[in-house]
Each structure stands twice: as structure tokens, then as C-alpha cells.
């Protein structure tokens, strides 16, 4: 009997081994992007991976290999292991294959073409003239406690001198204890979406953010994911992507018809899409396409890169309208291949690099962000009266203080015990650490102010340096709403230790209209200004600890200005500025302007100025504190017109100036970004040198390269010397591409950018200007270079080289090496 039992045991063991099921996934070796529909061969059986590169096999002999093949890769043989983990097969790209792109067959191309052509009748936002619905959205940042080790780790670190340092790290233990009790962060909102023939608008009915009595307005305007699957560009994490069902997208993606299935009683095609270049981190996913109407009935998207993103859209079929209407959106963000710190929503979720600590996985790397959005109370056909259609989102104060009973109606998961504890815990933490006040303070500092009682102190006025004034010490500010919401008083005073002169300015203002933020101001100032500087009065103000360009400037002029100013945002996408001013000007260098046979070493100019900034692609939110820009989209356009007043007392010259600027920035999900800055100006009439164009030079007139090492500017020409060129009309173009940080170890992680700048200009009536020798930009000016920013503690290096018709005779005179400095204020 014992022998029989032994034989049965051996037989069953062999049988179970023979039936071992292994789950696996095929990925790219370098990018970790899954390889969809790779060919799997095991024991003469052949099948394909699914659209996420996953597969299952029943292994009978672990000594026999699994063969994997896919176009553009070397064939891979790999032996499965029975360890309960996912069996990963890493494919290596065959660089000898000239064309690694994959292509769609004609049938699926025809289906996608019909989807594109039928958008107008299938996209609810286009097919329905009038509708409204409410939407509940819940955002959560959390982690699975079971995925985190609770052990206290011993970490060995080596400093820059090679010495070892051992320390205990309890961060994983503390993180596990935190997420066992509550989520890391959460926020939720209920909004009303209305649409008529002309526009769509969102009104927030209720909102709450853990740790805040009043929500952070900027978050409520974030567009982390497109509402519509038909939208082009399709947006993920505020990054525009070409939609795979757009006209351009059809040229960038390849499609595969998997099969057809029944979905809500209708035949649908399941179609997989991926980039033609299979290693690209562009969008890929699975579309369910109605076989009759060619509408999207379900969509699943994936992105694999510095973050891994999953997005799922589900729809309900409305039979009476022959339309698929959104049912739910789910969005998941996890850490991807990035080994640098990655921040999402400011500092709220932060994935840390584990390269220094040499541990398998940081606890924070287990964190994930989820968003779930559910429409309800759909009403079709009724005309929707939309107030203020130019405002994209309305945020009334009544939405802030909804009680727990209100939110209980939307609770989807009664088993989530951590949700309520998260609000209680973070509200207490926020109160204890004054987080809400710190956010308020951070916004002020970001704009260059720090609040002190009824005053907002202007941080830009405290200390400056330039070659003319030396150190400039001062104090300035503006009264805030604690004193009055209708009136404000701006002021500053400063003293230059090198020129031994006092400068000052005062600007009282009155609010004419709160809704349009229309202010009327009077201003008087006695100060100095940079020679031939071009500034746009509608540019937004952001705090910079220092402005590097003026440090090396020696040519200034004294200007006493009395002005009346009107500023308004009557149209949300258009900022307007109008002023009439009288200016007394005295150049503080050797200069004479010759006009109509008369020599001027000082002069008066009376003028009007109209400045416009148009942001046609941005969206705006109406908040209790006013209208704010929420979706800062490009391009943006600035236009400025200046006209002197010949018949006004105190005006010596007649001239006009027109200035234009546009900026366009393209972010990529890889973390890289590209930007274009185009700027131009033209001046007509008798224009003194103080009001011509110098095109922002930033190179000092010294012989040796090392003597010219100073701080680099933001958009300045680094190899152009001060006062080298002046123009009465010019154009300039700047192209820039910024790459991801490169981790070199020891906390050294430079962010590289390649930059090319060029400018052309002309000057007429050159003989009117005496005292300064300068050249014309008629033949053009060209420079290119590399920026290695944020190498260590915000410090970096830049190197630029000057070439083209205005190249100088000696090599080192064309070369510019500068120090860059960036401060991360954390918001």
C-alpha cells in the first residue's frame, strides 16, 4: 500500500508540474515599453501576446525555452521560472534593421478613416446642440500598504570623496504606517457642465480639498485628462498629444484589428493602436468602435515613460439619439522609467530616485494617483442659457462649504475606511503646520511680494546691482485688501551707493470695476533706466531673486515720469494697458541727439502707450478673488504701440513705435520641452538712442574669456556686446529645446538645453546719434550654444558661440561662458 501511495504522489507531482501556468509580459529592454502582439513559441505551439504585451503559458518542462519574436527585434529565447512572479522577457532592438516601423492593413485603415469622418455625428459635444449634466470627480493619491516593506533599512552612502557613511532609514516604515491609516491626499468636486450652440461652460457646485478650508483655485482649473476621446490635441497631464483618430494622428500611429465583440447589444470592433515607431513613448491603447456608427464605445489608453499612465473611458449607448455618451473616466498615474525626482501637482505626489540609496524600491515609488469621473443627471435638448461664455469655469463661494451629508450621496466605495480619516488627518495637519497660510504666502512670493499686515512688500526693490549704481538698496510695496479692496497705493524708494543718488516712485490706484479688474492709476517716478531697453507693459510678473542682465550694464539714462494709467481685463483673454505720460530724460553717458539742426543732451517726451496681450488659447476661471488664467496655453501674443504727442507742451520729438512678441512652448510627456520666441519692433520718426532697440545684449567689453564670465540672462544674446548694435527696426528669433535631467551621481544632475538665437535690424539717420560708436544689424546676428542648468544647488554653466556675418576675427571674442542660476521655489 505504501508503494502505491508513493507512486500516486510522484505521478500527481509530475502532473502538477506539467500543468504549471506562468503569466508573463514582453517588454523593450531599454524603454520597458510592452511589445504588443509579439510571437510566442513554446513546444511547437505558437500564439501572440495581447495588446499590453502580456501572455499566459502552461509549462510542462522548465528546461525548455520560450521563443519570442517581433519585427525590429532580435529573437529572444528565455527560460520560465516557477517563482510565482511575472515572467518578464526583455527584447533587444535590432539596430541593423533599416525600417523598424510597423504598418496597418487596408481594412483597419478604412475603419479608422470612417471614425475620423464620423466625429461630427458621434462626438456628443458636436452632435448635441444643447445638453447639460453633472459630474462627480474624485482624485486620490495613495499606496497599497501591502506593497511596502515595513523594515527599517541600513543604507550605505558614499560621499564625493569616496568615504562610506552608514545610516538607518525608517522612511519606508513610517510611510507604511501612514497609508495603513489614511490616503496620502484626496480632493473631490461636483460640477455642472452646460453646452449650447456657441460654447461650453463648467460651474463648480461643490468642492473640498483635504487640508484646506478654501480650495486652491489653480488645482480646480487643471486639465489632467481630456473630457472627450475625440478632442484633438488629446491632453494628458496638461500635455497635448495627437489623437489617434485625428487626421494627423492617423499618420503617426499603426492600427491592428483584433476581433469584433458585442457591447451593449451592438457589434463593435476592438482595435489596438500604437506609434509607428514602436519604441516611442506616445499614446497607445485599445479602442472599441461601433461597427455601424463608427463611434467610440470604449477607450483604453496607455503611456509608458517617466510615468506610466492608464486611462479608461466607458460609454452608455443612448438608443433614441444613436449616440454613445460618456459613462465614466478612470485615470491612473504610477512611476515609470524616470530615476529623477518627479513631481505631480506641485509637491503633492513625489516619486523619488532610488539610484543613490541602492535599495530595491522606495516607499514613495509605490504611490499612485487616481482620478475617477462620473457623469450623472444628463439632460438633453433643453436650451442652456450660459452666462459669461468667455469664462470657462465659474467657482462661486457657495461651493466651498458643503457638509458631509452632501458628499455622502457620491460615496462609491463604502469599504474605503481611509477616505474620511484622510480629511480629518490632513485638516489637523494643515492647521498645525499652517499649510493654508504657506500656500497663500507662496503665491505672493511667486509674484514677487511678501505680505506684512496691510502691505505687500515688493521683493524686487530690496537689493539690486549694476555697473552704474553699484549696489542699489531700497524698499517698496503696495497696500493690500486688508486696507481696502477699492484703493491701493504702490511706492518704492532706493539708493545707489556708486552714483550716490536717491530714486523713488509712487502710484495711487482706484478700482473702477471688480469683475473686469479695471484700475485707474496716477504715477510719478524719478529713476534710471537701461539704454534702448524693450519691455512689454502687459508681461506677467514673476519673482526672480536677481535679474542677471543689469549687473554688467553701465549705460543708463535718468527719467522723470508723470503718468495716468488705465488697466483692464474687460475681455478675459485680452489684457489691456493704456497710459499717457510726460517724461524728462537725461542720458547718463556721453551722448548727443541731433534733430532739425539742434543738439539735445537732455529732452522731454510726451506720449501715449497702448499695450495688449492676447491669450486666445488659454482658459479662465471666475473665482471669489477675480478672474485667473487656468489653462496657460500657447502661443501668446503681445502688441504695443507708442506715439509721441507733438502738440503737447514739453514734447521735443515726433515718433511712433510698434512692438510685437509671441511665445510658443511645447511640453512633452517625456519631460522635455521646446520653445520659440519671436520678437520684433519698428520705430518711425525722430527717435533718440534711448528709445531705439538694442536686442538684449549680455556680454561685457573685456578681452579675456575668463574676465567676461558673469551670469547668463533668460532670453538675452550672450555673445553680443553691450552697446554693440542699435536699430530702429529689428526682428529676432530664439529656438530652444530642453532635455531631461541627467543623473551623474553625488546630487549632480544637470538639465541640458540647446539654444539658437538670431536677429536682423536696420538703422536710419545714423548721423543723428553722437557720442557712442555702434554698428547695424543689417547683415544679421547668429549665436548657438548649450546650457547645462541646475548642475548643483541651482547653479549651472552656459556656453555660446557667435557665427555668421558679424562674427569677430578672434575665436575667443566669439565665445561666451556664463554662470546660470535657477531657484526652485517649490510652487
Predicted regions and their residues:
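Structural motif
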Residues: 19-36
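Short Pro-Gly-centered beta-turn/loop motif in secreted/extracellular proteins
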Residues: 32-35, 56-63
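Hydrophobic beta-strand segments
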Residues: 38-41, 66, 102, 133, ...
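A short, solvent-exposed loop/turn motif at the edges and junctions
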Residues: 42, 65-78
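Short, acidic Ser/Thr/Gly-rich low-complexity loop/linker segments typical of extracellular
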Residues: 45-54
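Conserved "repeat-terminator" motif of extracellular CCP/Sushi domains
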Residues: 87-105
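Structured extracytoplasmic
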Residues: 103-268, 276-282, 350-454, 458-464, ...
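Exposed, low-structure sequence patches enriched in small/polar residues
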Residues: 236-239, 374-376, 380-827
Amino acid at each position: 500500500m505504501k508503494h502505491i501511495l508513493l507512486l500516486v504522489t510522484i505521478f500527481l507531482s509530475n502532473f502538477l508540474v506539467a500543468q504549471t501556468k506562468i503569466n508573463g509580459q514582453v517588454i523593450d529592454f531599454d524603454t520597458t515599453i510592452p511589445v504588443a502582439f509579439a510571437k510566442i513559441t513554446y513546444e511547437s505551439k505558437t500564439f501572440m501576446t495581447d495588446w499590453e504585451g502580456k501572455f499566459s503559458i502552461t509549462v510542462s518542462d522548465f528546461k525548455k525555452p520560450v521563443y519570442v519574436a517581433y519585427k525590429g527585434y532580435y529573437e529572444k529565447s528565455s527560460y520560465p521560472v516557477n517563482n510565482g512572479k511575472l515572467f518578464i522577457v526583455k527584447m533587444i532592438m535590432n539596430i541593423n534593421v533599416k525600417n523598424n516601423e510597423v504598418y496597418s492593413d487596408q481594412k483597419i485603415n478604412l475603419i479608422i478613416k470612417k471614425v475620423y469622418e464620423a466625429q461630427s455625428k458621434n462626438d456628443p459635444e458636436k452632435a448635441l446642440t444643447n445638453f447639460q449634466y453633472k459630474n462627480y470627480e474624485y482624485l486620490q493619491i495613495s499606496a497599497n500598504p501591502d506593497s511596502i516593506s515595513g523594515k527599517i533599512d541600513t543604507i550605505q552612502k558614499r560621499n564625493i570623496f569616496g568615504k562610506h557613511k552608514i545610516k538607518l532609514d525608517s522612511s519606508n516604515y513610517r510611510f507604511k504606517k501612514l497609508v495603513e491609516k489614511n490616503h496620502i491626499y484626496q480632493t473631490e468636486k461636483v460640477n455642472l457642465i452646460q453646452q449650447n450652440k456657441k460654447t461650453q461652460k463648467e460651474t463648480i457646485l461643490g468642492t473640498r480639498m483635504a487640508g484646506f478650508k478654501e480650495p486652491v483655485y489653480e488645482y480646480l482649473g487643471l486639465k489632467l485628462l481630456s473630457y472627450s476621446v475625440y478632442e484633438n490635441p488629446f491632453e494628458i497631464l496638461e500635455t497635448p498629444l495627437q489623437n489617434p483618430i485625428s487626421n494627423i494622428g492617423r499618420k503617426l500611429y499603426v492600427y491592428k484589428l483584433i476581433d469584433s465583440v458585442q457591447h451593449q447589444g451592438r457589434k463593435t470592433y476592438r482595435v489596438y493602436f500604437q506609434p509607428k515607431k514602436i519604441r516611442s513613448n506616445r499614446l497607445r491603447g485599445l479602442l472599441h468602435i461601433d461597427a455601424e456608427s463608427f463611434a467610440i464605445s470604449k477607450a483604453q489608453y496607455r503611456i509608458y515613460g517617466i510615468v506610466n499612465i492608464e486611462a479608461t473611458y466607458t460609454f452608455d449607448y443612448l438608443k433614441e439619439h444613436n449616440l454613445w455618451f460618456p459613462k465614466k473616466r478612470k485615470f491612473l498615474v504610477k512611476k515609470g522609467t524616470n530615476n529623477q525626482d518627479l513631481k505631480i501637482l506641485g509637491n503633492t505626489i513625489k516619486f523619488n530616485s532610488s539610484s543613490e540609496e541602492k535599495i530595491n524600491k522606495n516607499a514613495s515609488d509605490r504611490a499612485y494617483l487616481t482620478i475617477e469621473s462620473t457623469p450623472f443627471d444628463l439632460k438633453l435638448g433643453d436650451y442652456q442659457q450660459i452666462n459669461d461664455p468667455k469664462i470657462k469655469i465659474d467657482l462661486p463661494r457657495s461651493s466651498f462649504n458643503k457638509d458631509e451629508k452632501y458628499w455622502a450621496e457620491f460615496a462609491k466605495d463604502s469599504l474605503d475606511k481611509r477616505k474620511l480619516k484622510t480629511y480629518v488627518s490632513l485638516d489637523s495637519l494643515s492647521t498645525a503646520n499652517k499649510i493654508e497660510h504657506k500656500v497663500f504666502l507662496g503665491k505672493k512670493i511667486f509674484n514677487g511680494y511678501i505680505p506684512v499686515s496691510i502691505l505687500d512688500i515688493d521683493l524686487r526693490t530690496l537689493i539690486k546691482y549694476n555697473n552704474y549704481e553699484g549696489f542699489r538698496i531700497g524698499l517698496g510695496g503696495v497696500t493690500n485688501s486688508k486696507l481696502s479692496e477699492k484703493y491701493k497705493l504702490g511706492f518704492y524708494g532706493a539708493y545707489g551707493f556708486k552714483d550716490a543718488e536717491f530714486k523713488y516712485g509712487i502710484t495711487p490706484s482706484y478700482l473702477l470695476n471688480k469683475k473686469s479688474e479695471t484700475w485707474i492709476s496716477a504715477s510719478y517716478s524719478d529713476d534710471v533706466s537701461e539704454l534702448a531697453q524693450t519691455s512689454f507693459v502687459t508681461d506677467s510678473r514673476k519673482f526672480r531673486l536677481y535679474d542677471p542682465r543689469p549687473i554688467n550694464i553701465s549705460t543708463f539714462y535718468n527719467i522723470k515720469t508723470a503718468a495716468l494709467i488705465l488697466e483692464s481685463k474687460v475681455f478675459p483673454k485680452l489684457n489691456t494697458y493704456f497710459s499717457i505720460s510726460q517724461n524728462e530724460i537725461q542720458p547718463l553717458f556721453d551722448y548727443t541727439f541731433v534733430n532739425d539742426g539742434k543738439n539735445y543732451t537732455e529732452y522731454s517726451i510726451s506720449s501715449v502707450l497702448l499695450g495688449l496681450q492676447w491669450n486666445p488659447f488659454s482658459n479662465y476661471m471666475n473665482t471669489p478673488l477675480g478672474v485667473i488664467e487656468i489653462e496657460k496655453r500657447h502661443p501668446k501674443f503681445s502688441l504695443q504701440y507708442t506715439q509721441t504727442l507733438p502738440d503737447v507742451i514739453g514734447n521735443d520729438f515726433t515718433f511712433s513705435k510698434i512692438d510685437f512678441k509671441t511665445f510658443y512652448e511645447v511640453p512633452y510627456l517625456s519631460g522635455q520641452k521646446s520653445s520659440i520666441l519671436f520678437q520684433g519692433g519698428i520705430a518711425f520718426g525722430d527717435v533718440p538712442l534711448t528709445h531705439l532697440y538694442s536686442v538684449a545684449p549680455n556680454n561685457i567689453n573685456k578681452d579675456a574669456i575668463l574676465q567676461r564670465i558673469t551670469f547668463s540672462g533668460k532670453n538675452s544674446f550672450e555673445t553680443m556686446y553691450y552697446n554693440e548694435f542699435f536699430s530702429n527696426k529689428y526682428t529676432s528669433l530664439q529656438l530652444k529645446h530642453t532635455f531631461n535631467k541627467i543623473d551623474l551621481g553625488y546630487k549632480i544632475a544637470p538639465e541640458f538645453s540647446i539654444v539658437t538665437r538670431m536677429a536682423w535690424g536696420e538703422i536710419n539717420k545714423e548721423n543723428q546719434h553722437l557720442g557712442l560708436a555702434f554698428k547695424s544689424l543689417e547683415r544679421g546676428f547668429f549665436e548657438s550654444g548649450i546650457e547645462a542648468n541646475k548642475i548643483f544647488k541651482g547653479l549651472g554653466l552656459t556656453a555660446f558661440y557667435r557665427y555668421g556675418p558679424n562674427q569677430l576675427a578672434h575665436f575667443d571674442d566669439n565665445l561666451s561662458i556664463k554662470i546660470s542660476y535657477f531657484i526652485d521655489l517649490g510652487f
